[in-house]
Design a protein with these regions (language model features):
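Long, low-complexity intrinsically disordered regions
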Residues: 1-246
Length: 246
């Protein structure tokens, strides 16, 4: 156990989050080429491991602010192209997050959990999931707009049957989201998005948790077991079980 003062703890946390160390090309700001800016954003995603998505936008959406705070004046178009250019996918980490495609195997435990659970809080989908999946296979990615809309009422969570079916398949790994258009999720087959070397569920639940605990600790730099667990919404017991390996 190390004794760390408050100032040192703050610096460790800020450094680990990428808020003390400027990217070597960040000073170029908007003068950097679009390709370089996209590469900067992808490198940032790789270092952070996950970037949370949120519908709320004041100055900008949260996934854009993450890049601005660490990379400076990169273009919004470069951020969007990097996140939705085929090198990342969207799944449940801390919340709905953008994740590098290389992390697909690490969330096998969560996909298995959803499959075993058998339903979301909405219940089992009443829409024909097989027909939806076949349509995506034949026609390519679709959004809820292509299947009648996402909602069947005024309430935020009052989803349509098609939306429930798409989200259930997303949870279970039958579909993947690697792009948004007009902020709508575009659902596709994972085998068309995730590179073959990462497209597997071979890791055990314990192996998944061990890798995500390490990733969470690296991102936090310093923190309690509960804080490290919350990076990827793991049980605190998972952090305690793998603490000796950190």
């Amino acid at each position: 156990m190390l004794d760390v003062g408050r100032d040192q703890a703050r610096r460790v946390a800020l450094w680990s989050a990428g808020l003390l160390s400027a990217h070597p090309t960040a000073a170029q700001g908007r003068s950097a080429s679009a390709g370089l800016q996209e590469a900067m954003v992808l490198e940032l995603l790789g270092r952070l491991g996950a970037v949370q998505l949120d519908t709320i936008s004041v100055l900008a959406r949260s996934h854009e602010l993450i890049a601005y705070a660490r990379l400076g004046g990169v273009r919004r178009s470069a951020i969007e192209s990097a996140y939705w250019g085929g090198e990342a996918f969207e799944y449940w980490s801390h919340a709905a997050c953008i994740l590098p495609v290389s992390s697909w195997p690490l969330f096998a435990f969560r996909r298995r959990h959803y499959r075993a659970k058998g339903e979301r809080w909405h219940g089992r989908p009443r829409h024909d999931v097989h027909a939806l999946k076949e349509r995506i296979r034949l026609e390519g990615p679709i959004s809820t707009a292509d299947v009648g809309g996402a909602k069947r009422g005024a309430d935020w969570w009052e989803w349509s049957d098609a939306k429930i079916a798409l989200e259930t398949m997303l949870d279970e790994g039958e579909l993947v989201v690697s792009r948004r258009a007009g902020w709508r999720r575009q659902y596709d087959l994972p085998e068309r998005v995730i590179p073959s070397e990462f497209f597997h569920d071979d890791l055990t639940d314990d192996e998944c948790c061990a890798a995500l605990v390490e990733a969470g600790a690296r991102l936090m730099g310093i923190g309690t077991a509960a804080e490290i667990a919350d990076v990827h919404r793991l049980p605190t017991s998972a952090v305690r079980a793998h603490a000796d390996a950190l």
